Amino acid sequence: MMKHDIEKVLISEEEIQKKVKELGAELTSEYQDTFPLAIGVLKGALPFMADLIKHIDTYLEMDFMDVSSYGNSTVSSGEVKIIKDLDTSVEGRDILIIEDIIDSGLTLSYLVELFRYRKAKSIKIVTLLDKPSGRKADIKADFVGFEVPDAFVVGYGLDYAERYRNLPYIGVLKPAVYES
C-alpha cells in the first residue's frame, strides 16, 4: 500500500481543495476581461489543473505541454526536454502556466523563455507548491498555493518514478523509498 511509503501528510486533501478554490477566485479576478490560454504542465499538474479550472469563472482555453528535467531521478538534470508541445499558438495570448511544484525552477524558466520567444502577450504562473530551497533558476510564481520544505513530496499529481500521483494529499516520501 502506498501509504506505508509516506513519512507524513504535509498538506491534507481538505487543505488543498480550500486553497484551490482561493486560487481560482484570484485567477477569476486576474483574467476577468481576457481569454487566457491555460497551459498545464504534464503529468504532475493534471489533478491541480482539473480542480483549479472549475473555480475560474471566466472564459479560458486549455492546452498541455509535457516537459521534463527529472526523468526518473529525484534531482533535476538541468536539461529540459519537450516531450509534448502545445497544439495552440501562444502568439499574442495571455498565458497562464499551471504547475504542480516549482523546485529547481529550470523547467519553468525554460517555458517562460520559450513563450516569450513565441511572442506571448503576457505570461503568469500559478503553482500549487513552491519549494524555494531547491531553486536553481531565478523564477517566481505569480500565484502560489503552499510553500513546502526541502523534502521529497508526492501525491496530488507529484510522483516518484511514476508512482504516488493518485494520492489525494501531499505527503513526504520516506527516504528509504528513493535511496534504495
Swiss-Prot record:
Signal peptide: none annotated. One of its GO terms (molecular function) is guanine phosphoribosyltransferase activity. GMP binds at K131, F152, V153, D159. It is found in: Cytoplasm. One of its GO terms (cellular component) is cytosol. SUPFAM superfamilies: PRTase-like. Its EC number is 2.4.2.8. It is an enzyme of class 2 (transferase). Diphosphate binds at K43, G44, R165. Keywords: Cytoplasm, Glycosyltransferase, Magnesium, Metal-binding, Nucleotide-binding, Purine salvage, Transferase. The active site is at D103. Its main location: cytoplasm. Purine salvage pathway enzyme that catalyzes the transfer of the ribosyl-5-phosphate group from 5-phospho-alpha-D-ribose 1-diphosphate (PRPP) to the N9 position of the 6-oxopurines hypoxanthine and guanine to form the corresponding ribonucleotides IMP (inosine 5'-monophosphate) and GMP (guanosine 5'-monophosphate), with the release of PPi. This is Hypoxanthine-guanine phosphoribosyltransferase. The gene is hprT.
